Amino acid sequence: MCEDFSFVDNPEFELFISQYSTTDASTLRLKRFDNLKFDKNLAITQIECRRKAKKKLPELAEKIVYPTDVSIEQCSSEILAKFHANLFAGCDAVIDLTCGLGIDSFYIAQQTKSVVSIDAAEIVTSAVKHNMHKLGINNVSVVNDFAESYLDKVKNPFSAAFIDPSRRLTDDRNSRTYAIKDTVPDLNLIIPQIESRCNFIIVKASPMADISQTISDFPGITEVWILSVKNECKELLFKIDFPQTAKQPQIHCIDFVANEAIEFTFKFEDKSISIADGTPHPGQQLFVPNASIMKAGAYDIVADKFGLIRLAANSHLYLSDITTNHEYPGRVFSITNVLSLSKPDIK
């Protein structure tokens, strides 16, 4: 369905949005409105999505149109989309194989000469075309097609590609997959289509994806980014360089806190490190790795770098007698007292 989104510039629409911005969406859908000059349900979708976008997309929240109610759920957040875009800095032409709401394409376009953005849903591409025009972005070409089909028909070379494949299996709406090899579009089909005309591809994946298994499934992976926001792991990024070469990838653990990105990088092969155990006592510091470090399984690597000892076997808590600087990728506490589990101490 090709949708005309010009109604969002209608003063009556803006008045509707303003008047009902805090009203429950279900209540609005049941309420009768006579002689509206726009689609009521689509307008209510805008209200719902704008509410959620205020935190997720603060720059764009009220400047774009949302084609469906899941648009805001599935899109990249502003902070992570800007990070994605930086990975393409200096590229001439980038292809976004899974456009969605177009947030990644929007920010990538600011770092590159041109972007081709593909999506199979016509209502989605209609919305993205409207948004790009309204935002003054003229170096993004939005195409309504399936990624595999487009790549079969168009043989143009690209500097790089970006893909955020769907994690839901197509034959079972109640089944969810976290393995990249099982997602849609099928990366196993995409790679042969682009590897001869592209320098690299960035693949976005669920934070639940198994990093070791993914590297095993796609030996051409050269870099991995584990991205957290305020100590909550949000997503994984995998870079595959072309031509593909099998080597140990670099793992970047990043946590975005306030306006700072706390990063720790290591080689995938470095994971086998032994850390001594110790006993806590007052005056020491207690170290808790952040979510990206935990997802990477790099807690002992970090401990080794910072000269820490482990609280106990199978523990991910660490100790030090020396006050460290603020570069530690996690939380740091001062130990003021150590209590046993005896009844007097517990009381």
Regions found by a protein language model. Give the residues of each.
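SAM-dependent transferase fold signal centered on methyltransferase-like domains
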Residues: 1-347
